[in-house]
Amino acid sequence: MNFPRASRLMQAAVLGGLMAVSAAATAQTNPYARGPNPTAASLEASAGPFTVRSFTVSRPSGYGAGTVYYPTNAGGTVGAIAIVPGYTARQSSIKWWGPRLASHGFVVITIDTNSTLDQPSSRSSQQMAALRQVASLNGTSSSPIYGKVDTARMGVMGWSMGGGGSLISAANNPSLKAAAPQAPWDSSTNFSSVTVPTLIFACENDSIAPVNSSALPIYDSMSRNAKQFLEINGGSHSCANSGNSNQALIGKKGVAWMKRFMDNDTRYSTFACENPNSTRVSDFRTANCS
């Protein structure tokens, strides 16, 4: 008999059991934790562990149009995220985030604005209106998301002027749990009042909202929150949009950030806070993230 080998197998079994117990303990102690322990592969995949369905909002209230994506089998209630596109753009530009985030345990609404020419402040107002309507649908028995949303846990995302709108939403609504603007633009770069954990996706070769006059000074202006700046190497203004070639990297970061701060799920801390150390990233900065 090979006792050393048997001993090693027993040690491995014990270690595996302890890890399973630890994962279960994390889920039990955090009422917001949803899904299995994350891995790099699971976060880089095009879909998470939950099945996703969607529906079009029949009567948008305070914004142009909306599509809601939601997990069917997450168990319990989940947080909600509103995502708004940029100047002249429609929700198709950011729709990839809908099923991606929903498959990891969020209710997500992607919206069209009343006018494609709306400015960041208007985009913020419409984004918050969309979140209010999600909360209303959560209380409507005929709604597909009836009883599925924890209305105390909400987040915002957006691209370009929608990113600027998301930053305004974060500044004006400190109860939001997380924000993730991509290639953000606003007439002001001072968001020093923001306390909401904020992840900024920037695009190195952005000629519409140049990094050094937009995303970076916005990041530098903030000091009261967990924050992160991730710049895509060689990326144009649409480097984080639907159809981009960086979805594995950006999706991993975006999902991990929302899970860490909207769900208070520390299983995602490493993925949310660490430097990806990828050739696709030309600049990375972070502070107060754990």
Curated annotation (Swiss-Prot):
Domain of life assignment: Bacteria
Keyword Phosphoprotein: no
Catalysed reactions listed for this entry: (ethylene terephthalate)(n) + H2O = (ethylene terephthalate)(n-1) + 4-[(2-hydroxyethoxy)carbonyl]benzoate + H(+); (2,5-ethylene furandicarboxylate)(n) + 2 H2O = (2,5-ethylene furandicarboxylate)(n-1) + 2,5-dicarboxyfuran + ethylene glycol + 2 H(+); an acetyl ester + H2O = an aliphatic alcohol + acetate + H(+); a butanoate ester + H2O = an aliphatic alcohol + butanoate + H(+)
Reported impact of residue 238 to F: Displays decreased enzymatic activity on PET film and on BHET. Exhibits improved PET and PEF degradation capacity relative to wild-type PETase
Entry's localization field: Secreted
Biotechnology: Has potential for application in environmental remediation and biological recycling of PET and PEF waste products.
Primary subcellular site in the record, as a coarse category: secreted
GO terms for biological process, alphabetical: xenobiotic catabolic process
Protein induction: Highly up-regulated during growth on PET film.
Effect caused by changing residue 159 to H: Displays increased enzymatic activity on PET bottle and on BHET. Exhibits improved PET and PEF degradation capacity relative to wild-type PETase
SUPFAM superfamilies linked to this entry: alpha/beta-Hydrolases
EC number: 3.1.1.101
Gene Ontology CC terms: extracellular region
Parts of the chain that traverse the membrane: none
Signal peptide: 1-27
Recorded family membership: Belongs to the AB hydrolase superfamily.
Domain notes: PETase retains the ancestral alpha/beta-hydrolase fold but exhibits a more open active-site cleft than homologous cutinases.
Protein name: Poly(ethylene terephthalate) hydrolase
Protein's organism: Piscinibacter sakaiensis (Ideonella sakaiensis)
